[in-house]
Every structure is written in structure tokens, then in C-alpha cells.
Amino acid sequence: MKPGIHPTYYHDAVVKCACGNTFITGSTKKEIRVEICSKCHPFFTGQQKIVDTGGRVERFRKRFNLEEK
């Protein structure tokens, strides 16, 4: 590695989430702020929301006069 061209690497960088969770990781920034983390993300918490796309399908069928089989 060439000296003087690489950013400083911090082994104790703090990641702060909007939910209040903090953890330590390695990064070129000393502090990182995120909006969502593994403690509050729906995939990890098991509280997934199901997106209702049924209305769009029904509108498509109605537009093209298709019947459900």
C-alpha cells in the first residue's frame, strides 16, 4: 500500500440507529448514523407487513375483461 493515500481505518467505529441501538464495527468513519438496523428491521423482528396488490390485479382483470379461473 502506498503511504498517505488511504483513508484512516477505525476498528472501533460506532454505528447509531434511529431506534437507539448502537454497535461497534470497522469503518473509515468514526461514527455512522443509520435509519434502520437488524434490531428494528421488519425482516429480523418477524413483524413483516404484507403489501396488498390485490386491487391492482383486480383492476387489470376488469380492464381486460378477464375472469378468475
UniProtKB/Swiss-Prot annotation:
Binding site for Zn(2+): 17, 19, 37, 40
Keywords of the record: Metal-binding, Ribonucleoprotein, Ribosomal protein, RNA-binding, rRNA-binding, Zinc
Cofactor dependence: Zn(2+)
GO BP, one annotated term: translation
Free-text remark on how the cofactor is bound: Binds 1 zinc ion per subunit.
InterPro entries according to UniProt: Ribosomal_bL28/bL31-like_sf, Ribosomal_bL31, Ribosomal_bL31_A, Ribosomal_bL31_sf
Gene Ontology, cellular component aspect: ribonucleoprotein complex; ribosome
An example molecular function term from Gene Ontology annotations: metal ion binding
Coiled coil: none
Subunit structure comment from the entry: Part of the 50S ribosomal subunit.
Family: Belongs to the bacterial ribosomal protein bL31 family. Type A subfamily.
Reported function: Binds the 23S rRNA.
Matches recorded under PANTHER family: 50S RIBOSOMAL PROTEIN L31, CHLOROPLASTIC, LARGE RIBOSOMAL SUBUNIT PROTEIN BL31C
Protein name: Large ribosomal subunit protein bL31
Species per Swiss-Prot/TrEMBL record: Caldanaerobacter subterraneus subsp. tengcongensis (strain DSM 15242 / JCM 11007 / NBRC 100824 / MB4)
Organism lineage string: Bacteria, Bacillati, Bacillota, Clostridia, Thermoanaerobacterales
Primary gene name: rpmE
